[in-house]
């Protein structure tokens, strides 16, 4: 992805949702994303993150420490939206469920129910419910706050919910639009 590619995609959007880790900071294209935020203060940039608790509280420090572009800072963002502890637990800290959050959600659900239960000690129905409670947070927040695009590295888990919420999803690692439903 080039900066020109990014500008072409984001020029059609006034309100943009940004993931933090592996996107705005410590990511392959973080320099491009930071530059875009700095170059476009006229847009409404929102941070939408799975950070919660102490990680959310240290967000400003992490943005500062991982700043690549001069002028990049938390003051450029219209809003910061972190997930609740309860919803975070549903996707990332389930002790009875060892499913890696990077697994493809749709593929995991193709496992026969009895095998799924034996492997993960949780029913597919409960897994699907927990997955929705956690991973629909970003697309739902984007829709509620008027963001028409989400830039995120965790596209496998976000795709389904972005489609449901009519939010375009840009893969922050590969630079590709993952769903093409939105017509700006």
Regions from the PLM with identified roles:
Residues 1-117:
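Alpha-helical substrate-recognition element adjacent to the catalytic core
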Residues 38-41, 142-145, 162:
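Short, conserved loop/helix-junction motifs that constitute active-site signature segments
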Residues 46-48, 148-152, 169:
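Short, hydrophobic beta-strand segments that form beta-sheet elements in well-ordered domains
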Residues 53-59, 156-160, 177-178:
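Short, charged/polar "capping" segments at the starts of alpha-helices
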Residues 85-89, 118-120, 177-184:
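Short, charged, surface-exposed secondary-structure boundary motifs
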Residues 112-130:
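Active-site-proximal specificity loops/subdomain of glycosyltransferases
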Residues 130-155:
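Conserved Lys-Pro-Asp/Glu-containing loop-to-beta segment of HAD-superfamily phosphomonoesterases
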Residues 159-184:
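Acidic, PIN/NYN-like endoribonuclease modules and their adjacent C-terminal/linker elements
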